[in-house]
Amino acid sequence: MSFFPELYFNVDNGYLEGLVRGLKAGVLSQADYLNLVQCETLEDLKLHLQSTDYGNFLANEASPLTVSVIDDRLKEKMVVEFRHMRNHAYEPLASFLDFITYSYMIDNVILLITGTLHQRSIAELVPKCHPLGSFEQMEAVNIAQTPAELYNAILVDTPLAAFFQDCISEQDLDEMNIEIIRNTLYKAYLESFYKFCTLLGGTTADAMCPILEFEADRRAFIITINSFGTELSKEDRAKLFPHCGRLYPEGLAQLARADDYEQVKNVADYYPEYKLLFEGAGSNPGDKTLEDRFFEHEVKLNKLAFLNQFHFGVFYAFVKLKEQECRNIVWIAECIAQRHRAKIDNYIPIF
């Protein structure tokens, strides 16, 4: 069997890999974006999107069109495509696709807790959640007053339970604790997903490990930068860093000691690809933000996943590229709706 793994890969997964590569061919090109940024109204945008693989996905929407409606329909289309693949997947691809949804579940839980903290109703918050991360117990999140209650009453029967072990405490849920929970969940999630991919091995591990290593390192950089000027201690900050990136262990130890942005940048200098990202970012008008530089690098890594065949990385890469495409379209739509065209070109090109 080990001599021709691609033969056995295709038995269970060949149809879906062919499907996802076909869907990837419909990702918007640079020429499509050049057309979109020339639109004067959202109706023009709708018309241009009809000539792409999006087709008439906005056909049933009444005028006047809004950015939030476009955003909702983009997510719906992406979720329909993803669920079709999940419904036809055999193990271990089914578990791999489930792992992709867990990050959206984490974001949804945090959004609901934060909204509840600010006295927003659950009925108002649930529509704002990402449909790829929906789960049955979501609407009960508002009853939890502490992380322990959140776990015991709601999350214990969800896939997130495995990531929640380090978050359980009797402290009240305030904004600082919620951010700590978010980052602790993501740390456990990324480390678990990384371990799963290494166990799958082969081309899947070759494609996915660099992507997840970058995601872990990006979170470590952002956690460090966002912690400056807050009450978060250096010891607590270090506990939030995922240990599956290229920064582990020396880089993370240096980030744990960092006191300002320059010291974070000095850590990045030891890693050539991260050094380039920090050097290309600035805070002056016209400069790209560090977040944009991270998004660009993420797109580059996800595109690389399509260079090899017979692996699961293409499914993750497709979802992330579509997610970036949705952000791009919404950004352009916002600029058109607000008549703020000066920054309309600040999207992240994909192809």
From Swiss-Prot:
Q: Does the keyword Cell inner membrane apply?
A: no
UniProt topology in membrane? Peripheral membrane protein
Could you give a GO molecular-function term held by this entry? protein-containing complex binding
- How is this protein annotated for GO cellular component? apical plasma membrane; axon terminus; clathrin-coated vesicle membrane; early endosome; endosome membrane; extracellular exosome; lysosomal membrane; membrane
Which keywords describe this protein according to UniProt? Cilium biogenesis/degradation, Cytoplasmic vesicle, Hydrogen ion transport, Ion transport, Lysosome, Membrane, Phosphoprotein, Transport
Modified positions (Phosphotyrosine) in chain numbering: 270
Positions in coiled-coil regions: none
Give an example GO biological process: intracellular iron ion homeostasis
InterPro entries linked: ATPase_csu/dsu_sf, ATPase_V0-cplx_csu/dsu, ATPase_V0-cplx_dsu, V-type_ATPase_csu/dsu, V-type_ATPase_csu/dsu_dom_3
User: Gene3D superfamilies per the record?
Assistant: ATP synthase (C/AC39) subunit, domain 3 (1.10.132.50), V-type ATP synthase subunit C domain (1.20.1690.10)
Please describe the organ and tissue distribution of this protein's expression: Ubiquitous.
What domain of life does the native source organism fall in? Eukaryota
Give compartment(s): Membrane; Lysosome membrane; Cytoplasmic vesicle, Clathrin-coated vesicle membrane
Q: Which residues carry this modification: Phosphoserine?
A: 283
Q: How the protein assembles, per its UniProt entry?
A: V-ATPase is a heteromultimeric enzyme made up of two complexes: the ATP-hydrolytic V1 complex and the proton translocation V0 complex. The V1 complex consists of three catalytic AB heterodimers that form a heterohexamer, three peripheral stalks each consisting of EG heterodimers, one central rotor including subunits D and F, and the regulatory subunits C and H. The proton translocation complex V0 consists of the proton transport subunit a, a ring of proteolipid subunits c9c'', rotary subunit d, subunits e and f, and the accessory subunits ATP6AP1/Ac45 and ATP6AP2/PRR.
| PANTHER family in UniProt | VACUOLAR ATP SYNTHASE SUBUNIT AC39 (PTHR11028)
Family assignment from sequence similarity: Belongs to the V-ATPase V0D/AC39 subunit family.
What is this protein's function? Subunit of the V0 complex of vacuolar(H+)-ATPase (V-ATPase), a multisubunit enzyme composed of a peripheral complex (V1) that hydrolyzes ATP and a membrane integral complex (V0) that translocates protons. V-ATPase is responsible for acidifying and maintaining the pH of intracellular compartments and in some cell types, is targeted to the plasma membrane, where it is responsible for acidifying the extracellular environment. May play a role in coupling of proton transport and ATP hydrolysis.
In Swiss-Prot or TrEMBL terms, this protein is called: V-type proton ATPase subunit d 1
